[in-house]
A protein has these predicted regions:
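Short hydrophobic alpha-helices and adjacent helix-cap/hinge residues
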Residues: 1-278
Length: 279
């Protein structure tokens, strides 16, 4: 099996000229022979393939991943499309943080200036409306990183931080992976929580998390079913079945959170075993 990976970088370049260049490249590379399967991941790539796929790759099955239910609502997906939805559970992580810090009165929500950050912060704000009588929310969205770090270093008491991706800041600076999150957790005067397992190890306490690895496996299984002869229209769009409570042991110690306060079945990463644990 030959797998070709195309990194579109639509987060940083999304103008019409750039998109046309991408389409021309795909036409040149994949018109003959056509691929047997296309797997776009995350909103920008999925939107591009759904819009232009029928012209570029007529009849080629599409299995998408990394998008929420709202993304596909009211979209005409076509008969050769199926996929795997991952609905981010913002309230699960917020409930967790409020339970572990019962004296919380303020929640600072952090997100970047790019399309991913803006989209997720909008969904997050909508999800958190039900909590507005319980705690005050401050939305730190699209700030230059230096300004964001200054605010996080001087948060009021009884605050927790809910971090969404900061892949681009308000000054136009781009960040790779968890680069910005590591800086956020290092300076924050309050514990930081998030909702994706790939964020564990950056200095966040933890969260009620979905797994990139499990999502990838699920998308791959759908793709294999199609390559083995099933038709996309016969495979229902699937939703992520489970979320996991996951924590960084080092941050539990940093913020004096007792392990017996964690939900049953929690996964604790980076735990340093004592001699009693080992023997």
């Amino acid at each position: 099996m030959v797998v070709n990976i195309e990194y579109l970088d639509l987060m940083h370049f999304d103008d019409e000229r750039y998109i046309q260049i991408l389409l021309d490249i795909f036409q040149y590379k994949y018109s003959k022979p056509k691929p047997d399967l296309i797997i776009p991941v995350f909103n920008s790539a999925v939107a591009l393939v759904l819009k232009h796929g029928p012209d570029l790759f007529p009849g080629v099955p599409i299995v998408f991943g990394g998008v929420e239910s709202k993304f596909v609502e009211n979209r005409s997906l076509g008969p050769n499309v199926t996929g795997y939805l991952t609905d981010n559970n913002y309230t699960g992580t917020l409930d967790l943080a409020l339970n572990l810090h019962p004296d919380t009165r303020h929640v600072a929500v952090v997100a970047g200036a790019g399309p991913i950050g803006r989209g997720w912060s909008k969904a997050c704000r909508e999800a958190f409306k039900a909590y507005e009588e319980r705690v005050d929310f401050t939305y730190l969205i699209g700030l230059p990183l230096e300004a964001l770090l200054e605010k996080l270093a001087n948060l009021s008491a009884h605050t927790v931080v809910f971090s969404l991706p900061v892949l681009q800041d308000g000054a136009g600076k781009n960040f790779i992976g968890n680069e910005s999150l590591s800086q956020i957790t290092r300076v924050s005067s309050a514990p930081v929580y998030s909702f994706r397992d790939v964020n564990i190890g950056t200095g966040i306490v933890g969260g009620y998390m979905s797994s990139f690895e499990e999502d990838g496996k699920a998308v791959a299984q759908l793709g294999l079913r199609i390559l083995n002869g099933e038709q996309p229209e016969d495979i229902p769009i699937t939703r992520a079945p489970t979320f996991l409570y996951m924590f960084d042991w080092r941050q539990l110690k940093r913020w004096s959170i007792a392990e017996d306060k964690l939900p049953q079945g929690s996964i604790i990463k980076f735990k340093q075993l004592t001699i009693w644990d080992m023997y």
